[in-house]
Amino acid sequence: AELGADGVDVLHVQMDNETPEYLRFLRERAENRGVELICLSIHQDFVDPNKDTRDRNIDHTIHCIELAKELGISYIRLNSGRWNTTSSFDQLMADRGIEPILPGFTEDDGFDWCIGSIKECLPAAEKAGVVLALENHWGLTRTPEGLLRIVNAIDSPWLGALMDTGNFLEDPYDKLEQIAAQTVFVQAKTYYGGGEWYTLDLDYPRIAQILEKNDYQGYISLEFEGKEDPNTGVPKSLRSLRKAFGQ
């Protein structure tokens, strides 16, 4: 709240714990500060030939859906997962997010695993009233075609696209426009001070026009990835986004 935000996108791995007392503390702290808890961003990986591994990721996702419900959060950031044939994230970024398919399998296998896994999470999402927002992240959703292949195959009101403005490294505006109609949540990257792996000079007025054209009326969540001190970088980013989106 002190930095000028209206809401908080909670990163699950940064939560201190998951006790009822801690969840109540987060809810009350947000309410007392006049901010809304808007999304629970979680990590899972459905791109694995081992069914037991996929089942553990399904269970984790369903567990996080229940956490979101307890926190009064309406959206969960979902990942498709990736092949994990690249040993480090630094190397993956050096390779522009592209990695080889696991030997002995095909891209279709990965999509089948991911689609089947997300389908198993949907009853819990519907029961909790929590929308799953699949991010254009690394792995199967690195391209708009990959993201839309999953969302369109499932075709559920409880699954949509999460537009991360900084994850299409080439021709971003054309690709963002391709997923805009399916977008239910937006994470907007800024890079003041330079990014950790890369820096994009994003035209946010242009992105705002893309979203407006597709009647997007949801949240714009700042994802600050710059090296500048967040005490100055975050307020600067929020001012820039408010100006671009007319808020």
Task: Describe each region flagged by the PLM.
Residues 34, 41, 80-82, 183, ...:
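Short, small-residue-rich loop/turn micro-motifs
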Residues 1-4, 72, 119, 123, ...:
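Histidine-acidic metal/acid-base catalytic patches
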Residues 17-18, 56, 113, 139, ...:
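Residues that cap or flank secondary-structure elements
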Residues 9-27, 82-87:
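Glycine-rich, proline-tolerant flexible connector loops at the mouths of alpha/beta enzymes
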Residues 12-14, 44-46, 80-84, 138-140, ...:
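Active-site-proximal loop/turn and secondary-structure-junction residues that shape catalytic pockets
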Residues 18-24, 50-57, 230-234:
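Metal-dependent catalytic neighborhoods of phosphoester/phosphodiester hydrolases
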Residues 9, 39-41, 77, 133, ...:
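Conserved beta-strand positions in the central sheet of alpha/beta enzyme cores
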Residues 29-36, 47-160:
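Active-site acidic/histidine proton-transfer and metal-coordination neighborhood
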